[in-house]
Amino acid sequence: MIGRLRGAIAEKQPPHLVLDVNGVGYELEVPMTTLYRLPHVGETVTLHTHLVVREDAHLLYGFYEKRERELFRELIRLNGVGPKLALALMSGLEVDELVRCVQAQDTSALTRIPGVGKKTAERLLVELKDRFKAWESLPGTFTLVSNGPNHADPVASAESDAVSALISLGYKPQEASKAVSAIKEKDLSSADLIRRALKGMG
């Protein structure tokens, strides 16, 4: 299994990216929380990875932090949660935000994510609560940490990147475009645009 990759970012097309590792391009799908923190195309990054093997494809998922990968692995173990829904959950919420939702059994944040209704949110929170209790015994797993530097995308492409990211989360193209266009602040990074758009659609 491929557990970690270090290389230069060759392409960024949310939620996908291509990592050039010694001349070999690895295509990965990443949550928006990882995408927010990636450097520019051409710069080097290390990603923790998880490989899903299917009959018709080998799918590689990348994460900025190891604990994000561990959360992804926990999520896809849950009944009815595949990689797509797991990435949507992790794109809509930071790890610590999701942990707080589980601890408080708060469904409101989860139901803002496409594909997650109230019943699904309630079930996920109940199933995750016991798993997170086990995680709390692991040093550093849930300590609140800084997200690190936020490498803003070029302003000219920020809006299109944000729209693409929202579409990848399950929103319709018209909804995504409308939500981004409704944001009045100028010169925001794609990460900030995505966050504001998600709040506006919540």
UniProtKB/Swiss-Prot annotation:
It comes from the Bacteria. NCBIfam families: ruvA (TIGR00084). Its main location: cytoplasm. This is Holliday junction branch migration complex subunit RuvA. Residues 1-64 are annotated as: Domain I. Has three domains with a flexible linker between the domains II and III and assumes an 'L' shape. Domain III is highly mobile and contacts RuvB. Residues 144-153 are annotated as: Flexible linker. It is found in: Cytoplasm. InterPro entries: DNA_helicase_Holl-junc_RuvA_I, Hlx-hairpin-Hlx_DNA-bd_motif, NA-bd_OB-fold, RuvA, RuvA_2-like, RuvA_C, RuvA_C_sf. SMART domains: HhH1. It comes from Pseudomonas syringae pv. tomato (strain ATCC BAA-871 / DC3000). One of its GO terms (biological process) is DNA repair. Residues 154-202 are annotated as: Domain III. Residues 65-143 are annotated as: Domain II. GO terms for molecular function: ATP binding; four-way junction DNA binding; four-way junction helicase activity. The keyword DNA repair applies. The RuvA-RuvB-RuvC complex processes Holliday junction (HJ) DNA during genetic recombination and DNA repair, while the RuvA-RuvB complex plays an important role in the rescue of blocked DNA replication forks via replication fork reversal (RFR). RuvA specifically binds to HJ cruciform DNA, conferring on it an open structure. The RuvB hexamer acts as an ATP-dependent pump, pulling dsDNA into and through the RuvAB complex. HJ branch migration allows RuvC to scan DNA until it finds its consensus sequence, where it cleaves and resolves the cruciform DNA. Pfam families: HHH_5 (PF14520), RuvA_C (PF07499), RuvA_N (PF01330). Belongs to the RuvA family. Homotetramer. Forms an RuvA(8)-RuvB(12)-Holliday junction (HJ) complex. HJ DNA is sandwiched between 2 RuvA tetramers; dsDNA enters through RuvA and exits via RuvB. An RuvB hexamer assembles on each DNA strand where it exits the tetramer. Each RuvB hexamer is contacted by two RuvA subunits (via domain III) on 2 adjacent RuvB subunits; this complex drives branch migration. In the full resolvosome a probable DNA-RuvA(4)-RuvB(12)-RuvC(2) complex forms which resolves the HJ. The gene is ruvA. One of its GO terms (cellular component) is Holliday junction resolvase complex. Keywords: Cytoplasm, DNA damage, DNA recombination, DNA repair, DNA-binding.
